[in-house]
């Protein structure tokens, strides 16, 4: 049975289609009246109804032919990645190849050159490579029996004539050939242009211009793509240019680490892909750390280790030792029979050639990001291990210069040691210097205002570095060292980036996965090593690096594994062994809701390559056994229409059938609607249609082996996922749902390793929620429009009873009571008296009161449970004065960036990961293991409380924000909300506090008041993290040190936080809707906020009175609660969703009675 109809959802004709057809991967019944067992493409061709699916059907046929052709040429079928590339070529898409070493990039390009009809141009960096490719092409052509004219360009007269006459099918040349012969090349039309090495190609800007002219772009279009400070109109025009059908496909075979010059942007702006290489930060490395007495002992131990490990090692000294020490170390090794080379002995190109030949045991360098042995060495078959003679370090002189990068780095290093206003000043200085990191000291004279500010920053730091107390603070800190050298003082901290890059040379990405490596760090200064570990955890949260001792490692077994991987790498580089591993490498599309989440996930595994597909942005990054492609749907793609049936639901027959269409958004106002014409009347700017996002998702789904839909883990996320599942199913049958409750590498990996089917019960519950909101809301809203003559008024099944609570509470707040605030021995107490006159009398006689303490008892104080959506919204409102709407936006950002678990939850449950991987390490480190007291709090189930995803302190997140590692729209409040969550969670996993409580008794002849207070803490616990009580100061004499009388409401009006608590308590709304309900009441001007309290307006009262008087059944709290309970039952599969819709359908009668329903 179909759950919904989707207008413009048919993949073939763009017409209306039912969900049950899409689930089977079929087009609509108009295109294909009867479901068929044969291929859909063949059936549509037979019926002559093939339309929008034609490019995909044609590609399928071409791919089938190409697979046979490839197998004939190479002796094996193309593997997954090569099939993806082939599909892109046949779909006329240009792209840069993202792939590990040894997956047959050049082989693919050559076979595709032979397969395609039309001319092919292949550009290589050198004539030798062009010649080798030409020879290989001839060999492949012979195997498949293809008679194509292959011309390797040389300046010989006969070859030049052959070129000019067009007597060739495939032309191979160098970068210089293109530069010199563009005027002749422009006369030819190419089907494919293949660039083998984009790095060398980009060195000549003119060549890039020539390339884009060969691809059919005009000079004006190239100029627009290179224009700085583009307007929105420019971007719209570029989008139209990108979508224009082109006859020539460009394949860039190897992407570049650092695109040179602005011409690299031509690829993104005109072709929709980056030429920046996707860098994987995945590593398969055993990390070892060994304490030593000094550098001499490190050297002696390393000799022993190197002799055991053998050839293919890299040895690093930190920058603290300098170049002279590098040569000393090299000579030391040579004396001990180790064939050591130094990076100083050769130019970088020569050094690489020596390493590539394997003519060395170890190469010695400096563990700094600019050292040639730290970056750019990609020799998976040669490099086996790395030895660090001391931890990589950042070294800052205490004698400062005006260098912006130096001052920036030093400020960041010392940030946590500054206090109060100076800490804020230091953060501002870091933010300022961030803009000028490329500015050299000698350039500052050209910018007097900048120089003046940099001098101010230098003076700020110098004053601190002259302060003995501050220097003492540095010495006592756990991760910053003050080191003397040659009569000068240096500030030293660990260099995480250099460690990741240098050790990463031992584990490279090849076909079939990461090669195994070993990294050994010797350290004589425990502080320096701790500093490195801390920064690795901070900067590389996804790496989860854990150092072992050498004694814990089975070295013989590890050496064997390392050597097996090197053998595999050699075979792959020689073209052997690929057939065995090719099927292990898959292509996977992951669809999430937001671009932020897409970027976060892609960033877990390296620096992704960006690609535009229609209006979708796709991030591509290699992940072990697969190429990961991540894209975002930007929330819901479909919504209920308004112009069909009963407000979007066909109700002439039973069961009812909701009708959905793509969401259209006004770019200027962000207003959304499913009807283009409706929005056009209200929108001055461009209207964007989610259909364009769907087209992009469909296209990428078609390319890959499998699709995982990873929308949010709740009913709303399930409905978004279901829509994406339906719309993608005709293009890929292998679609699964991946669910994770925190955006972390571990949770993500587990989700894609344990996918599930879409949960139709959750989908049905969300369908019901949307339809009920529409039926009740629209029906009552239409009636209000007629009654009040205001078309912006609205009513809702939750909104209306909640408005009633606000009105009732406000009326109750007009009644006053007495509140006596007094301090006894400076301890604040509050006495509340209902009778105002009596309260005043007590206040007057307070000086006569007898105050005593009695009845001591030992008690255990327990912490509060961790946050749920309602409690965090209440606290953020009360403590930080943030609106519920603002807090939800911040929570969404924190979740998507991977700092907290899913924030729409009513569960207090803490998982084992939360208890033992997040709480325990932090509590043990800060207070001692005896303070750790694991609690599960809530019952089992999928949902968890809101908690941090790792033991990252708020001050560390502040550091990350300042350093630009973490970015938020409102960083200040994001940090405050994170701090609330962090402290409350950590306290929830700490032991109870044991206290002595006593009754404080205040007595008058006519009145007695008692309250139990804590007078002593016998044993601290959670109170050290998140105190929920104050300790009363016991003295011999108890006296009133302050008193104050106030008339206060008997009950206060609701705040946003207390209203949400009331909604939770009374079972109205859900975690995903609490904030929106409050926001709607404010937006409709039914309530206003005054001093944090919600006050009903006259309009709010009138609307509520009208609705409750005329339609009590549909605005009652009881009905709303019953419907919420019914939806929970639908989620659990205990209730038929149609029964609920049938019950509520009665509301349609109201429209007929009021004659308000206008078709």
Swiss-Prot record:
A zinc finger (RG N-terminal-type) spans 1-40. Its cofactor is Zn(2+); Mg(2+). GO terms for molecular function: ATP binding; ATP hydrolysis activity; DNA binding; DNA topoisomerase type II (double strand cut, ATP-hydrolyzing) activity; reverse gyrase activity; zinc ion binding. Residues 759-1152 form the Topo IA-type catalytic domain. Binds 1 zinc ion per subunit. Coiled coil: none annotated. It is found in: Cytoplasm. Mg(2+) binds at residues 593, 712. Residues 583-1159 are annotated as: Topoisomerase I. It catalyses: ATP + H2O = ADP + phosphate + H(+). CDD domains: DDXDc_reverse_gyrase, SF2_C_reverse_gyrase, TOP1Ac, TOPRIM_TopoIA_RevGyr. Residues 587-743 form the Toprim domain. In the N-terminal section; belongs to the DEAD box helicase family. DDVD subfamily. NCBIfam families: rgy. Introduction of positive supercoils requires the cooperation of both domains. The helicase-like domain probably does not directly unwind DNA, but more likely acts by driving ATP-dependent conformational changes within the whole enzyme. A beta hairpin in the 'latch' region of the N-terminal domain plays a regulatory role in the enzyme, repressing topoisomerase activity in the absence of ATP and preventing the enzyme from acting as an ATP-independent relaxing enzyme; it also helps to coordinate nucleotide hydrolysis by the ATPase domain with the supercoiling activity of the topoisomerase domain. This is Reverse gyrase 2. The lineage of its organism: Bacteria, Pseudomonadati, Aquificota, Aquificia, Aquificales.
